[in-house]
Amino acid sequence: MMKVLVTGADGMLGRDVMRALREKHVNARGVDVADFDVADGAAVREWVTAEKPDAIIHLAAYTDLLKAETEPAKCIDVNAMGTLNMVRAALAIGAKLMLMSSSEVFGAAPDVIHGTRDKTCAANV
């Protein structure tokens, strides 16, 4: 049976993803900031290596838009470096990685459907 690690499992989207995985009887382990900080590369490697998931669904993100303006370094640590840490950990054990983001990474382009290869132009992190 496939083993899936879900980061950001206590978040709005994470709870729904965990519920959907459980309904499909997927062996899923949800983690959140209480378990480890995705910005801490050593902690990410330790968790991912110990869990040895076949796939990682990376939902952990710094989502407080107001605080992101006053705490840009924390936002970058979680959203950019945290994602890089998850990519590196997945590569190290040969796990598949699914990254969730939002259309905001493409900038202000109303009524446009974007593809996976479209250039990003985020106004924020």
What are these regions (language model features)?
Residues T70, D77-N85, A92, K96, ...:
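Catalytic helix-loop patch of NAD(P)-dependent Rossmann-fold dehydrogenases
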Residues M2-E23:
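N-terminal Rossmann NAD(P)H-binding glycine-rich loop of SDR-like oxidoreductase domains
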Residues R22-E46:
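Adenosine-cofactor binding site in Rossmann-like domains, unifying the SAM/SAH pocket
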Residues G14, L65-L66, F106-A109:
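Glycine/Thr-rich phosphate-binding loops of Rossmann-like dinucleotide-binding domains
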Residues K24, E51, A92-I93:
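Helix C-cap/helix->beta junction micro-motif
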Residues G41-V78, A89:
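NAD(P)H-binding glycine-rich loop region in Rossmannoid oxidoreductase-like domains
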Residues T7, V31, I56-A60, L97-S103:
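SDR active-site strand-loop-helix element
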